[in-house]
Amino acid sequence: MAAVVAATALKGRGARNARVLRGILSGATANKASQNRTRALQSHSSPECKEEPEPLSPELEYIPRKRGKNPMKAVGLAWYSLYTRTWLGYLFYRQQLRRARNRYPKGHSKTQPRLFNGVKVLPIPVLSDNYSYLIIDTQAGLAVAVDPSDPRAVQASIEKERVNLVAILCTHKHWDHSGGNRDLSRRHRDCRVYGSPQDGIPYLTHPLCHQDVVSVGRLQIRALATPGHTQGHLVYLLDGEPYKGPSCLFSGDLLFLSGCGRTFEGTAETMLSSLDTVLDLGDDTLLWPGHEYAEENLGFAGVVEPENLARERKMQWVQRQRMERKSTCPSTLGEERAYNPFLRTHCLELQEALGPGPGPTSDDGCSRAQLLEELRRLKDMHKSK
């Protein structure tokens, strides 16, 4: 019966996804171990995470990225609910993880760590386009993992760096960001799992609120509430002052190089407020996003603002990087202000590019939210060449 309901919910929007879902359902029925894994996930969630989440707005719609770019490429609100609220989402994530490991045995991109005074930021390419991160206090030999979706890849980096994992920072609940919490927290018994209690993050042990600070050695990491992509989405700001270097923003699915995440669980006004939280940070802040979407996003930005020279220069650099499969992160927030359309809703040039409408400086912010909503609609329709 469940297979019929799932297939019906997806009818007309992705027959192939329905077949995948039926396969997962039938496989899970025959596989008792999968059910045990599900019960284990539920039993280890924090008390806060056991509460029933608020219902999603009926206006929400999930539109897929181009094929192969998104672990949640099945479409529809029904699928989103299954993905985030049931064990089917975990099984789907495991399937995507196996495929990515086979396709990219050394990761989807070549990354380079950034070294500061006793602090190292190490990007780890996982799945088909995700990034996890290790933030390391090199003097103390302590590490913090951000969004460790592939525990095998993250553990390999931990062993290579010869550090002790003491904390996991989860930006949000989606499996492509939280899927490694179980294995890593079991392997590293003293490891704490941080995140928002509103998001149902698996294996959460230490709930965080807006402006809470996580301290690990010399690392001072502040949580900033940025709802919109999910209700409890957080970004993490590593303070650069203790090591006399630039601050680092680990943005999850809020902000990408020249892009932003979809508003799955909120409104345009909510997402605008979250993006404004980032805009308040300094220009030299390094942006470490959750996905490698740079080339696609800059292509869309060129459609919106074709005469933006900052975007053109960045696109040329990104294309050279991607020809060699090199990572494009980090960028800086100063750069993003110059070419990221989702951070430029206050700019008259962008409003004029999208046509007439209310002024971008209205006191209630309504017109900026409308512009953001229109940008999101156009981005979802955009296809990269």
Swiss-Prot record:
EC number(s) on file: 3.1.2.-
Domain of life, per lineage: Eukaryota
Record-listed Zn(2+) 1 binding positions: 172, 174, 229, 253
Recorded coiled-coil stretches: none
This protein's UniProt keywords: Cell membrane, Cytoplasm, Hydrolase, Membrane, Metal-binding, Mitochondrion, Phosphoprotein, Zinc
Cofactor note: Binds 2 Zn(2+) ions per subunit.
Cofactor(s) needed by this chain: Zn(2+)
UniProt-listed Pfam families: HAGH_C, Lactamase_B
PTM text: Undergoes cleavage at the N-terminus.
Induction: By Hepatitis C virus core protein.
A molecular-function term among this protein's GO annotations: hydroxyacylglutathione hydrolase activity
Bias type Polar residues, positions: 32-42
A biological process term (GO) from this entry: regulation of dopamine metabolic process
InterPro entries associated with the record: Clx_II_MBL, HAGH_C, Hydroxyacylglutathione_Hdrlase, Metallo-B-lactamas, RibonucZ/Hydroxyglut_hydro
Family classification: Belongs to the metallo-beta-lactamase superfamily. Glyoxalase II family.
NCBIfam families recorded: GSH_gloB
HAMAP family: Glyoxalase_2
Protein name in UniProt: Probable thioesterase PNKD
Name of the gene: Pnkd
